[in-house]
Amino acid sequence: MVSRRSSQARGALTAVVATLALALAGSGTALAASPIGEGTFDDGPEGWVAYGTDGPLDTSTGALCVAVPAGSAQYGVGVVLNGVAIEEGTTYTLRYTATASTDVTVRALVGQNGAPYGTVLDTSPALTSEPRQVTETFTASATYPATPAADDPEGQIAFQLGGFSADAWTFCLDDVALDSEVELLPHTSFAESLGPWSLYGTSEPVFADGRMCVDLPGGQGNPWDAGLVYNGVPVGEGESYVLSFTASATPDMPVRVLVGEGGGAYRTAFEQGSAPLTGEPATREYAFTSNLTFPPDGDAPGQVAFHLGKAGAYEFCISQVSLTTSATPPPGYEPDTGPRVRVNQVGYLPFGPKRATLVTDAAEPVAWELRDADGVVVADGTSEPRGVEPSAAQAVHVLDFSDVTTQGAGYTLVADGETSRPFDIDGDLYQQLRYDALNYFYLARSGTEIEADVVGEEYAREAGHVGVAPNQGDTDVPCIGPRDYYDGWTCDYRLDVSGGWYDAGDHGKYVVNGGIAVGQLLQTYERALHAGTADALADGTLDVPEHGNDVPDVLDEARWELEWMLSMIVPEGEYAGMVHHKVHDEGWTGLPLLPADDPQARSLHRPSTAATLNLSAVAAQGARLLEPYDPQLAQTLLEAARTTWAAAQEHPALYAPGEAGADGGGAYNDSQVADEFYWAAAELYLTTGEDAFATAVTTSPLHTADVFTADGFGWGSVAALGRLDLATVPNELPGLDAVQSSVVEGAQEYLAAQAGQGFGSLYSPPGGEYVWGSSSQVANNLVVVATAYDLTGDERFRAATLEGLDYLFGRNALNQSYVTGWGEVASHQQHSRWFAHQLDPSLPSPPPGSLAGGPNSQAATWDPTTKAAFPDGCAPSACYVDEIQAWSTNELTVNWNSALSWVASWVADQGSAEPVPTAPVVTRQPVDATVALGADATFTAEASGVPAPTVRWQVRAGRGWKDVAGATGTTLTVRATARTDGTRYRAVFTNAAGSVESAVVRLTVERAAPVVTQHPADVRARVGTRAVFRAAADGYPTPCVVWQVRWGGGSWRPIPWATSTTLSVPVTVLAAGTEYRAVFTNAVGTAATEPAELAVQRPRS
């Protein structure tokens, strides 16, 4: 999971180029600049002139502006740039931005500044006060010089402004450019000679039939071991180019073609790692925009190179090559996503969820049909609109056909005029995936031959890094020399660190990544052991050479990595007992490169606390699992676990720096090691049962922390590994119930995220950003949810895991399976130096069961291929390219396949049998609710069971219970009123196996003192009538009201009969100036209204 900067991986190439003296000084055509300069006016008119205007040119605003007088003649006003060279037959693009203070159409042209005033471009742009960006592309039909001669006027760009408006107006111009497509190579034809091109590593060239042909001998480990190169090409950052050539290869053979740096770091502006060539000459054309600048000369000039080195012999022929500038940037990458109905292309288990996603803008449900292999409709229904799925920026519907249980192959879903890719319904779907995912690790072994008798001829290869030339490792490896990022550390010993697994697409071996990978392989076996399915991983089940030793094959594979990790322990000195962080090449190598052909020197890197604790954890884990098969090795592992634990305690903050990832290998930098301490303590406790390790576990700040985060766990965040093992491996840790509950709670969070996902994924990272290796984050989240099912038997977790797996196998934004060999359209060109069939047909593709890294929306981490594919960005779950040089999205690595291995083994155990019915068990009890009067109270209850239980809510009615009409969901909502105060409720869950009631809960309406909501108003009334006052108040219990009266500002006196919110009193002469108020009272308090006065009108005399 490390950046494989193969575009900078030129350490070996440097020596090759120096030896073959390819750094030739070129004299290529200068980089095509606009013949009119930069075209901006920040520094003045820049050679532009005006005539007939009302005043001089004005560039004070950064644009060139002129005032056009009223009533001007058609040719009487203009803005002109003279001295513009134009070449007949050349294609140009004129670009500019212009405005006019009044709506007007002007004349813009490229032509002659003199008779006969010919033009090669003549246009009439309509302008307004809003800036208009104009682009005109044309091929010149004449030649105009930059300097005028007799009868040969100079070229010009002119804007004729007169005669187009009766009123005075202002014209402004900015960002003017005239670009042409310029050939940058001085020699483009190979009909007769190489010209300034250099050829090496091939036979002598033969020139015939308008082309050059050479024989390649084969046996070349690097693409650059043979090549055709021209140095001296100027390349500019941000400029666009088109590279084309006509070539052939017999037999068919892809070659590596690049535009890049002919020295230094050998960076590339463009690279096509596998330009396909066949026996028939064909023209290949590649448009690109450079993100780098290379000069035409110096120690690292720009170059065009064909790297021809291959393992097999072949003939290469080429007739022409061209590199031209282009005014038009190439379009972005548009993936072929196939039908808009997205399914798990592998299929579905008979008794599990079966959902698909339809990408559609339809606002209403869409009809769907499920068809069998013969096209017969076996089920139908309508979709559920889900709105826009943010991770894909696509509007989606969900199709649910879970009720179909009939097994069969070749099913398809049809909806909205689209037919899905085919899939199966079969209980044995994933049995082979269990083995494919685990078989990846034998092929990743270092230090041993990969035997054809075990894996077949396609994947067989020589042992890598066993001290046989050209290898310089790994039997006697020194420490890296002093580096600033290691504070000058080095060592004076050498170690035999052969063995182990190659980490990813390179030849490096890393303890922290190997640690999580071997840990998950051991977890895969230990889970099967406790689930009663260990026979599925027994001796003879995997493609490994240890068959017949009565040891489960997955443990044989884990042992290979464990023994290598033991060899990485520091033997002596200040850091004795610590573990070296990694071993890898001292410089990057290119692709393809078999391990046995790697010529780089190797070095050990400084120990780290993280690496030391990784070994402590997996050595303890391995000790308990290998003890029945090899007690001596188990004892060695346990002793190493203790030793490294103690060493980490002594050096708790020795971190791997990020700067250590610049040369030859990834950094795997990690300065947060509390999680490694927690994991190691957990494994040591589970193996030994010792109180000291139990204490280390329970006192860790991570023991009660939420370690199951939205973005999942990985090599840099391993506390989840310890928590999962503590929850599942039998032990007597205090508070074990809480540990197990934390796993279930973490899984519930993933279920909540899945409910909002249009593609059913369990991965919902913070901010929606998909990380490097997102496929493994998906897989690790599946591990958590599947473990929750193992702990509880709750069918929700089983269903969520099965549905979450759909994402990896094609139910996603790209309609793409990320597991090689699994699904109709699956990743098969992952970044690897030896699974590199895309670059060399004699090499294999990644093996079936290889998990690709998957979408990565972190643009700062992108490789050049991915950057070129998405110049304008991409929806997070669509940032993926199945291309071997796209290492930031398409790498493969041991810790990603270890996660897949665990999940594959779990899902294979689910089989085809219908789940055994189990009675409902309440998993979430409702709780009492106290809410304000008029508010809604909600009660939620959940239960597990097989089949999934139905739910109905009941309310206490007298001495019995009565169903609440329509209340059949897991949440009940009740309005808080005086009538519902004190009401009791419960949920009843029922399935075929039984029924269970939840706890009884009570709704309580909050008590509240009276609050006046209506004050009485003053009243003016005639004698002999009645005056009416009104008041109101809220409160609970409902307040009582008593009206009061007073005269002349005296004391308030109650009116005993006035106990309504309305008071009606007779109006008499004596009542003049009387005041009234209402007093509201309940058990909580009292509130009085503002007083209201009665004004008496005397009767008319």
Swiss-Prot record:
Q: Where is the signal peptide?
A: 1-32
Q: Can the keyword Repeat be found in this entry's annotation? A: yes
Active-site residues, Swiss-Prot/TrEMBL:
D506 (nucleophile), H831, D882, E891
Which residue ranges does the record assign to the CBM-cenC domain? 64-173, 212-318
Q: Which UniProt keywords apply?
A: Carbohydrate metabolism, Cellulose degradation, Glycosidase, Hydrolase, Immunoglobulin domain, Polysaccharide degradation, Repeat, Signal
| Catalysed transformations (reactions) | Endohydrolysis of (1->4)-beta-D-glucosidic linkages in cellulose, lichenin and cereal beta-D-glucans
Q: Where is the Ig-like domain?
A: 918-1006, 1008-1097
Q: Where is this region: Disordered?
A: 838-865
- Stated EC number for the protein is 3.2.1.4
Q: Which GO terms describe its biological process?
A: cellulose catabolic process
Any idea which GO molecular function terms this record carries? cellulase activity
Q: Which InterPro entries match?
A: 6-hairpin_glycosidase_sf, 6hp_glycosidase-like_sf, Cellulase_Ig-like, CenC_carb-bd, Galactose-bd-like_sf, Glyco_hydro_9, Glyco_hydro_9_Asp/Glu_AS, Glyco_hydro_9_His_AS
Q: Which Gene3D superfamilies match?
A: 1.50.10.10, Galactose-binding domain-like, Immunoglobulins
Q: What class of enzyme is it?
A: hydrolase
Q: Is the keyword Signal assigned to this protein?
A: yes
Q: Where is this region: Catalytic?
A: 329-880
The entry assigns this protein to a family as follows:
Belongs to the glycosyl hydrolase 9 (cellulase E) family.
Q: What is the role of this chain?
A: The biological conversion of cellulose to glucose generally requires three types of hydrolytic enzymes: (1) Endoglucanases which cut internal beta-1,4-glucosidic bonds; (2) Exocellobiohydrolases that cut the disaccharide cellobiose from the non-reducing end of the cellulose polymer chain; (3) Beta-1,4-glucosidases which hydrolyze the cellobiose and other short cello-oligosaccharides to glucose.
> What is the recorded name of this protein?
Endoglucanase C
- The organism encoding this protein is Cellulomonas fimi (strain ATCC 484 / DSM 20113 / JCM 1341 / CCUG 24087 / LMG 16345 / NBRC 15513 / NCIMB 8980 / NCTC 7547 / NRS-133)
Its gene is: cenC
